[in-house]
Regions:
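Trp- and acidic/polar-enriched beta-sheet ligand-binding modules for extracellular glycan
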Residues: 1-45, 55, 65-147
Length: 147
């Protein structure tokens, strides 16, 4: 993610979205991205522009320090966007992006590694992290090949 940047998110109540891209592991809950509690069928999301287009082979999602306030589940959508759209346009486009990682259960205070569950095998340069229903993620890392 060296050079990646958050483009848009729907909620940064307790922790800024940019924290999720910081180096190393989080030092406390405030050093991650955390959304306020929501009820019902809502979910929170964050869109990140990757530093370069690549084929993702592994995803790490770290809920370090998030013990009672980690998301129950998450999914990741992705796309290769060849134009330079506004943040508003990217948000609209993201609703139709394909799944990179189907909805998976998360656990408290743990580094989750997903390799075999990845769906999309082509190049991407944007991701959308969906967390269900809300909560905090300390870090996210994408590992793969730049072609």
């Amino acid at each position: 993610f060296n050079g990646a940047a958050p483009i848009a998110c729907n909620n940064e109540h307790f922790g800024k979205a940019e924290n999720i891209l910081a180096p190393g592991r989080g030092i406390n809950m405030g050093d991650g991205w955390e959304t306020r509690r929501s009820r019902g069928k809502n979910f929170d999301w964050l869109i990140i522009k990757c530093a370069t287009a690549a084929q993702v082979n592994k995803i790490q999602i770290d809920t370090h320090h998030f013990k009672g306030n980690y998301p129950d589940q998450c999914s990741i959508q992705a796309s290769l966007v060849k134009i330079k759209p506004s943040a508003k346009k990217i948000v609209a486009m993201s609703k139709k992006w394909k799944q990179l990682l189907n909805k998976v259960k998360l656990k408290a205070h743990k580094k989750h590694n997903f390799r075999n569950k990845l769906i999309k095998k082509s190049k991407i340069n944007y991701i959308k992290i969906n967390i269900f229903p809300d909560g905090g993620i300390s870090r996210i890392r994408l590992l793969g090949k730049v072609n």
